[in-house]
């Protein structure tokens, strides 16, 4: 056998040994797990960093190895939940460099976005950019959850099939990119989360234009010349940014079923009285802020997180406005 052939043979043997080690490690861990819990199963293996992930009854654990196959870290956990504010299709905050905590997360851990997700925006169908972004989020170790804001394409968002997830209704954009619908309560590791997306667009001084209006082009040109902000119906604005009576009533029913008590409330905008604290008369009250005021006055909760106003601020001990920060809540 010449030197080159010997080198190739040695590399092949190394690869086979590495694979045998992986198989042995996996079988050993599974055998140990089965002795403790017959229902444990491996649901993810990330070979690059030598991590095995397991789940059991919606609980999760991971075991991390060094290159010699020895255990260097073991974690058994309830789900971890982080929360952040408006993204507007800019998901750079979820890069590994900006959000290093994700290194130790799994699909049983969650990041919640408080509206203006922006991942479902293109007019008629998913664009190449959207597909790339949604696939990228779906590839993350964690699961992305979001309530809707006022900057979503509701024609497309509401066209996704309605599914049940953790006790509430959702739209699944990807298997681990999930829209939390309005008026729902989700149970995650014993924590109850009430969600209610939507808000009024307050940056439309020029009004809403109708594409089929005979004077559409003329009106648009005038508004552009005067730099007045406007929206175009079913292109950049949808009436569903504000809730329907049915959505509000469903929220009331679900809260009543939980004795009007939840751990967390996640919305896009906030209650009328809270909005006054934030901007005085800058923001107008509407059907949703008044509905959320009703919730605020009648529901027992620990923390309320919301976005929309593009700031990071503890309004009071219970209500937290969040924008670009990512904070852990569980």
Q: Whereabouts are the PLM-identified features?
A:
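Active-site-proximal beta-strand elements of phosphoester/diester hydrolases
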Residues: 78-88, 190-199, 266-268, 321-324
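Active-site-proximal loop/helix segment associated with metal-binding centers of metalloenzymes
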Residues: 191-282
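Intrinsically disordered, glycine-rich low-complexity segments
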Residues: 8-20, 25
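Binuclear metal-dependent phosphoesterase catalytic core
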Residues: 62, 75-77, 283, 290-298, ...
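Proline-aspartate-enriched helix->loop->beta-strand connector
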Residues: 262, 266-267, 300-301, 306
């Amino acid at each position: 056998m010449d030197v080159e052939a010997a080198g190739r043979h040695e590399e092949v043997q190394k690869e086979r040994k590495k694979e045998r080690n992986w198989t042995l490690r996996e079988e050993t861990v599974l055998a140990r797990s089965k002795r403790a819990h017959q229902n444990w199963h491996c649901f993810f293996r990330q070979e690059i960093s030598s991590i095995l992930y397991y789940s059991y009854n919606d609980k999760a654990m991971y075991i991390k190895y060094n290159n010699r196959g020895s255990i260097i870290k073991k974690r058994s956990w309830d789900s971890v939940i982080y929360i952040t504010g408006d993204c507007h299709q800019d998901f750079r905050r979820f890069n590994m460099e900006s959000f290093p905590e994700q290194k130790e997360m799994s699909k049983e851990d969650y990041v919640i976005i408080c509206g203006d997700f922006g991942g479902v925006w293109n007019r008629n169908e998913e664009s190449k950019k959207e597909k790339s972004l949604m696939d990228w989020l779906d590839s993350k170790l964690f699961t992305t959850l979001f309530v809707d804001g006022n900057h979503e394409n509701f024609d497309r968002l509401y066209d996704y099939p309605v599914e049940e997830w953790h006790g509430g209704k959702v739209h699944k954009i990807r298997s681990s990119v999930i829209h939390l619908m309005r008026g729902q309560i989700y149970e995650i590791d014993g924590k109850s989360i009430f969600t209610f997306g939507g808000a009024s667009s307050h940056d439309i001084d020029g009004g809403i234009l109708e594409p089929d209006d005979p004077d559409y082009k003329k009106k648009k040109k005038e508004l552009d010349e005067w730099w007045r902000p406007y929206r175009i119906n079913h292109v950049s604005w949808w009436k569903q940014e504000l809730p329907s009576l049915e959505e509000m009533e469903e929220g009331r029913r679900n809260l009543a079923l939980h004795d009007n008590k939840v751990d967390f409330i996640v919305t896009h905008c906030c209650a009328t009285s809270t909005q006054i604290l934030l901007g005085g008369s800058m923001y107008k009250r509407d059907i949703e802020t008044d509905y959320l005021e009703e919730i605020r006055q009648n529901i027992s909760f620990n923390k309320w997180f919301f976005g929309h106003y593009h700031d990071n601020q503890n309004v009071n001990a219970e209500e937290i406005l969040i924008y670009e920060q990512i904070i852990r809540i569980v």
